[in-house]
């Protein structure tokens, strides 16, 4: 990301909360600023949104603003909403179409793997999420997008989270939406994908 560029954040409620002062999107914008890069954010996270809804609104919400970059965070609701969710085959089509649209509009795309649904990897929903995230890793390779593997980062961060944090709420407030520690984890993951060094990543802390 270069000085003066625009970054669109497309996502669900996790991204909507990411626009708050302690949210991952704002932490990233502030981290860029600390490195002398002033980026203009477009925050477009909407609670409950799935890949089909994001595909319908990506032009209006993000691409009409001609962003240089777009982060794409989608998958939790596709899985979490069960029968009202989006099956894997449709998810693949929707996410591929979103990336194609963004790249055709001249935006570089950074894909975020979906963070965990409750902080227990053995849970049914997290197991169901695995093929969705595996697809995102493949999509990033195929389309030459950057990838922030936040699901892997979250699993690692939970292993080292202090024992005095409440069980099930070490990185989240409710098992899904990030607490300040989770937002730092996400911001660092995205910044790492953008090429931040370990020293630069260490400066991203809770606000």
Region spans (language model):
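Short N-terminal segments immediately surrounding and downstream of signal-peptide cleavage
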Residues: 1-5, 203
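Catalytic nucleophile-elbow at a beta strand-turn-alpha helix junction centered on a G-D-S/GDSL motif
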Residues: 5-20, 49-50, 79
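Short, histidine-centered active-site or binding-site loop motifs used for metal coordination
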Residues: 11-13, 45, 76, 115-116
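Alpha-helical cap/lid subdomain in secreted, periplasmic
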Residues: 26-40, 52-206
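Catalytic cysteine-centered active-site loop
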Residues: 41-48
